[in-house]
Amino acid sequence: MPAEKKRGERKMQILQVIAEMLQDPKGERITTALLAKKLDVSEAALYRHFASKAQMFEGLIEFIEQSVFGVINKIVADEDNALKQIHAILSMLLGFAERNPGMVRVLIGDALVNENERLQLRINQLHDRVEATLKQCLRVAATQGHEETDPAARANLMLSYVVGRWQQFAKSGFKRPPSELWEKQWPMLV
């Protein structure tokens, strides 16, 4: 097996173990010592793949960004009805959290406490991008004959709803799914 492929696989393995550790409802802080122990490698071996723990979290954030915005772009490209776009985007965000509970702790900033502040800034940017997409969809919805509301306020409400559901999921020890009551609450958001 080529060394580059092996190196890439080890990087992915490290990120997967971090994501698994983040799923622990106790929410213990992830240290490189604990991570190395779980992987049965030395801390030095971790640093051969990532220059810092912050870089490991950046790898998780990149995965989240690629996953979320890959699907959002597909939804916007494939669906003409703006309200259906919004519903699909919000459903995807809630579903992504259910399928990736460890990532929720990154998305709400829980796992980033006491880490490099640029990580939280990057998550804030991700939230801002999602909100901007929702705002644009709401503007398009107004041109399609749907009730015209303040797109900025409505987009902020929608994102706040999603982040609140993520927060509730994490704080419940991943017992209360983000999509719980979603279809009943959707009409209240639009």
Regions found by a protein language model. Give the residues of each.
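C-terminal peripheral helix-coil segments that are non-catalytic and often amphipathic
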Residues: 1, 95, 99, 132-140, ...
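Basic, helix-initiating cap at the start of DNA-binding domains
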Residues: 1-38, 55
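Amphipathic alpha-helical segments enriched in hydrophobic/aromatic and basic residues
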Residues: 22-25, 31-32, 43, 53, ...
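Short hydrophobic/aromatic patch on the recognition helix
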Residues: 40-50
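Hydrophobic alpha-helical connector segments
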Residues: 59, 73-99, 151-158
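Amphipathic alpha-helical packing segments from all-alpha helical-bundle domains
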Residues: 66-69, 73, 117-143, 152-156, ...
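Amphipathic alpha-helical segments used for helix-helix packing
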Residues: 97-118
